[in-house]
Amino acid sequence: MTLLGTALRPAATRVMLLGAGELGKEVAIECQRLGIEVIAVDRYPDAPAMHVAHRSHVINMLDGEALRHVITEEKPHYIVPEIEAIATDTLRELEGEGLNVVPCARATQLTMNREGIRRLAAEELGLPTSTYRFADSEASFHDAVAAVGFPCIVKPVMSSSGKGQSFIRSAEQLAQAWEYAQQGGRAGAGRVIVEGVVKFDFEITLLTVSAVDGVHFCAPVGHRQQDGDYRESWQPQQMSELALKRAQEIARHVVLALGGHGLFGVELFVCGDEVIFSEVSPRPHDTGMVTLISQDLSEFALHVRAFLGMPVGAIRQYGPAASAVILPQLTSQNVTFDNVHAAVGAGVQVRLFGKPEIDGSRRLGVALATGENVEEAVIRAKKAASRVTVKG
């Protein structure tokens, strides 16, 4: 039984978001729909989710003492990490003291770096993955590349959005790739993973919900990546029945091994009927923003329903849909959006995130579209995104 209090009253149910970007903003909105009190935390002020939260705090979430202080002050009933760069040791301590970390502290810790989740998937669960080696020095990095072979990919074990990642074709690239990986790690220089290149037809994100009434799957989400970030996503991605069954089996194994209730973004490579595990995020996934228009319950609504202990029941997918990012390049602390009226229409929506500033290239919004088929939906979403003019 789920008992929900009313925000700003003595019996309020309080949710603290650790990470207040565009994904956290949608989670906050879903919490608001249920009258939940929302506290948004991030490393910079005026982050998107702070606009729709009851209160907000600006801290370095990798600082365990600062994290413990704000959690002790606010006394949330649910702590919901929305990014990886968090002092997960502190979350495990707090969970041990009786606090509720979503989906659980172990999941946030294992998925914070690529080594934890890769060893769980490949070595404990025996799931198919790319070949890989880990290295923590330049010498061991050279050994790892020799073991994996060319071509290969090097990534910091702790990074996101393609930071520090290189595609290596020859030995001449090794020194530069090592240096770039050391600069791109989320917590500074350190350990890297060297991965063999997987031959695949396409990548999917299988949004998987672990809830009180079992494990549920959204229709597979296809996506296109560029420079480490997604540019378009679409649902449903067409694939064979056997490949879909195998993808669901892998996702089920992973989320049950991680534990807890919530939505997980399970990333997989698909080649014919074969499926290979890539990564998993124990939270809503950026490629899953397409579900804001493609499903009766978005990935954000599903996440909230699951971690509150409510049953999911079933997920209704409306039909072909797509998302395309609005990714301008400029420098401004006073961003404006022009021509939005020309972007929206029947079956086409726009979401603007409300990020306070931009310095270079930054994702500031997303266009959402439906279509007769996936190809048409992608074209409509891209056209809508291109019509929005960002100024500053």
Swiss-Prot record:
Residues reported to bind N(1)-(5-phospho-beta-D-ribosyl)glycinamide: E22, L23, E82, D286, K355, R362, R363
UniProt gene name: purT
Self-association and partners: Homodimer.
Keywords associated with the record: ATP-binding, Ligase, Magnesium, Metal-binding, Nucleotide-binding, Purine biosynthesis
Organism: Salmonella newport (strain SL254)
Family membership: Belongs to the PurK/PurT family.
Domain ATP-grasp, first and last residues per copy: 119-308
Pfam family, one: RS_preATP-grasp-like
Gene Ontology CC terms, in alphabetical order: cytosol
Matches recorded under PROSITE patterns: ATP_GRASP (PS50975)
Keyword Oxidoreductase among UniProt keywords: no
Enzymatic reactions: N(1)-(5-phospho-beta-D-ribosyl)glycinamide + formate + ATP = N(2)-formyl-N(1)-(5-phospho-beta-D-ribosyl)glycinamide + ADP + phosphate + H(+)
Protein's job: Involved in the de novo purine biosynthesis. Catalyzes the transfer of formate to 5-phospho-ribosyl-glycinamide (GAR), producing 5-phospho-ribosyl-N-formylglycinamide (FGAR). Formate is provided by PurU via hydrolysis of 10-formyl-tetrahydrofolate.
Entry's Gene Ontology BP terms: 'de novo' IMP biosynthetic process
Residues involved in Mg(2+) binding: E267, E279
Gene3D superfamilies (alphabetical): 3.40.50.20, ATP-grasp fold, A domain, ATP-grasp fold, B domain
Listed EC numbers: 6.3.1.21
Functional pathway: Purine metabolism; IMP biosynthesis via de novo pathway; N(2)-formyl-N(1)-(5-phospho-D-ribosyl)glycinamide from N(1)-(5-phospho-D-ribosyl)glycinamide (formate route): step 1/1
Binding annotation for ATP: R114, K155, S160, S161, G162, K163, G164, Q165, E195, G196, V197, V198, E203
Transmembrane intervals: none
GO molecular function: ATP binding; magnesium ion binding; phosphoribosylglycinamide formyltransferase 2 activity; phosphoribosylglycinamide formyltransferase activity
Protein known as: Formate-dependent phosphoribosylglycinamide formyltransferase
